[in-house]
């Protein structure tokens, strides 16, 4: 199904295909509604990631949900349930995040749990083992990416 609510299933399916067909250290995922503003971003960020000790497995613009709350995302996406609770977790926003191959393997082992969620970026952070989130890299994505809507206005 090709709708907003199916995004967690589509992303985890894409991760599975990538894992089955490619050898990779990291995978980058971005929204299709953002435009890269700096051509050197990926060269720079890959350099940073590969030099980090201990190894970083997950990064992007970090959201730290300290207290569970009732989501209001249905106001932007009416197809979402109105009673969706966002649990306490750390996750990276969907505009851009990256995962190590180990993190992808970990998430694929939790495929069913990821697919039960409605918000893809949140589902990734919620289901990724905490040990793989101990050394997250915070990226100020708004410095490197622009929403397509902002670009066209």
Predicted regions and their residues:
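Active-site-proximal specificity loops/subdomain of glycosyltransferases
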Residues: 1-25, 39
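Conserved catalytic core of nucleotide-sugar-dependent glycosyltransferases
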Residues: 8, 26, 30, 34-126, ...
């Amino acid at each position: 199904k090709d709708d907003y609510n199916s995004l967690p299933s589509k992303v985890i399916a894409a991760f599975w295909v990538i894992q089955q067909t490619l050898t990779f250290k990291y995978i980058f995922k971005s929204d299709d509604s953002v435009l890269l503003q700096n051509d050197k971003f990926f060269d720079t960020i890959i350099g940073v990631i590969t030099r980090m000790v201990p190894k970083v497995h997950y990064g992007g613009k970090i959201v730290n949900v300290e207290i569970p709350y009732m989501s209001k995302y249905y106001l932007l996406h009416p197809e979402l349930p109105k009673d969706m609770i966002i649990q306490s977790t750390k996750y990276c926003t969907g505009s851009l995040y990256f995962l190590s191959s180990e993190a992808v393997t970990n998430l694929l082992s939790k495929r069913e749990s990821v697919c039960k969620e409605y918000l893809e970026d949140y589902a990734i952070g919620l289901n990724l083992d905490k040990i793989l989130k101990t050394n997250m890299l915070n990226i100020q994505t708004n410095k490197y990416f622009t929403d397509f809507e902002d670009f066209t206005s």
